[in-house]
Amino acid sequence: MPQDKRNIYKIAREARGLTQEAAAEKLGISDSSIRAYETGQRVPPNEVVELMAICYDAQHLAFQHLRETNSMYGSIVPAVPDCSVLEASAKLINRIYEFADSHSDRRLMRIAEDNVIDLDERPEFDAILEDLQEIVEAALAVKCARQGGA
């Protein structure tokens, strides 16, 4: 039973306050399909997950699904934390200010201006990429954030 609680599809459905039957009806699929997805017997197709994200008002579900079912996606796109729009917005703005205040944008341009990243520049370039990855993660969190009162 604890394994069911960690199922991303079940968590999203329950957060919306829907029964399996109500969700199945809204999604136009069978109750048994919902059960199979939520117990891990079957992986829902992307089209069904897209409908779940809309029906459950859980945009982050689409990101979670892709990260869990597509290893290439998971290695490129950062995890999207489940947080409120206020938390996500504050984190995004803080990361942008930190990036600008550290003059990382200027350092990136200086490194890239000759179109070559040499061995001496590589550590700084990689550090800048990590900072940019944090900004991307924060922006995705804003996109998927829970709205106030939800």
Place the predicted regions along the sequence by residue:
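Short, charged recognition helix plus adjacent turn
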Residues: 64-95
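Acidic, glycine-anchored loop motifs typical of Ca2+
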Residues: 81-84, 102-124
